[in-house]
Design a protein with these regions (language model features):
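Sec-dependent signal peptide recognition
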Residues: 2-8
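Hydrophobic h-region of N-terminal signal peptides that target proteins for export
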Residues: 10-18
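Beta-lactamase-like hydrolase cores
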Residues: 18-64
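Flexible glycine/proline-enriched surface loops and loop-helix/loop-strand junctions
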Residues: 55-60, 104-105, 113-120, 147-154, ...
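Short, well-structured active-site flanking segments
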Residues: 24, 79-95, 180-185
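Active-site SXXK
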Residues: 62-86, 111
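Mid-domain, small-residue-enriched loop/turn segments at the edges of structured enzyme/sensor domains
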Residues: 100, 104-108, 120-175
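Structured C-terminal helix/loop/strand segments within mature extracytoplasmic catalytic/sensor domains
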Residues: 20-31, 35, 62, 125-130, ...
């Protein structure tokens, strides 16, 4: 695993990244510039116990999590029974949806991979406000706000989470530091698995994109493993533009992962 090549080694106050080196990565700026987007990227190297950060101000700024909230939503749902298991089928109501992939029945795995909003709104509805608020506090997830309604608070309501908080949440999930069962953790991990490279690296990740809100954002958060051992955790977001609405987040992430851990090379 490559070590972060520091442009500037510094302590980034308030990032909840104590006892770890934190490096401001000016060289990552070129990846964002290539797509003409503003954004942030944080990558944690568990072997070196160090963080690389592009845009130290934005990495602490809270945004709507959008569909990345499917991760805590699913964990909570499994814990409280809003999702019975990986085989439970959530039935499409037959009404037209924005994408064809949404117009069918779904399970936990397909609902996560196809980012099925209506399914996870049903999960949140089953969980209810009181239990949702309690679990967000236990997870220390963002500002823990559920203002805006139980089916909308992560899409256009009051919930806000920063890229650093997203990355730390994924670390807690993978390291077994969230108050959830091994079963819930395993099922959500399985649903987040995206691909495995020829080099033996496995990517677990989730996208998220807001609609028409005051601060639109596109997310990609996740981690990479080599033979079951995490080698990098990451969280990034960009402000979508008309010229490059969504593709930038994946391209930038893959470029940085290739640079830092040889992902996809």
């Amino acid at each position: 695993l490559k070590r972060f090549a520091p442009s500037l080694l510094m302590l980034l106050a308030g990032l909840n990244a104590t006892a770890a080196d934190q490096v401001l990565r000016h060289d990552w700026k070129r990846h964002f510039a290539a797509y003409g987007v503003e954004g942030t990227f944080v990558l944690f190297d568990p072997e070196a116990n160090s963080y690389g950060v592009h845009n130290v101000v934005r990495v602490r700024h809270g945004y709507l999590p959008a569909s990345t909230f499917k991760i805590p939503n699913a964990l909570i749902g499994l814990e409280v029974g809003s999702i019975r298991d990986e085989r439970e089928v959530f039935r499409w109501d037959g009404h037209p949806k924005p994408r064809a992939a949404l117009e069918r029945d779904h399970t936990l795995d397909s609902g996560m991979k196809d980012s099925v909003a209506w399914m996870f709104q049903e999960v949140a509805h089953r969980t209810g406000k009181a239990r949702m608020k309690e679990w967000l506090a236990q997870f220390e997830y963002g500002n823990q706000s559920i203002e805006g309604g139980i089916e909308h608070f992560w899409l256009q309501g009051g919930l806000r989470v920063s890229a650093m908080e997203q990355m730390e949440f994924l670390r807690k999930l993978e390291e077994g530091r969230l108050p959830v069962s091994a079963r819930s953790r395993r099922l959500v991990r399985d649903a987040l698995r995206i691909e495995e490279t020829a080099g033996g690296l496995t990517l677990y990740a989730k996208t998220g994109t807001t609609g028409a809100v005051r601060e639109p954002v596109a997310w990609w958060v996740g981690w990479v493993e080599r033979r079951g051992v995490p080698v990098a955790y990451f969280a990034m977001n960009v402000t979508p533009t008309k010229a490059e609405p969504l593709g930038a987040r994946e391209a930038i992430t893959r470029a940085i992962l290739a640079q830092e851990i040889g992902y996809g090379l």
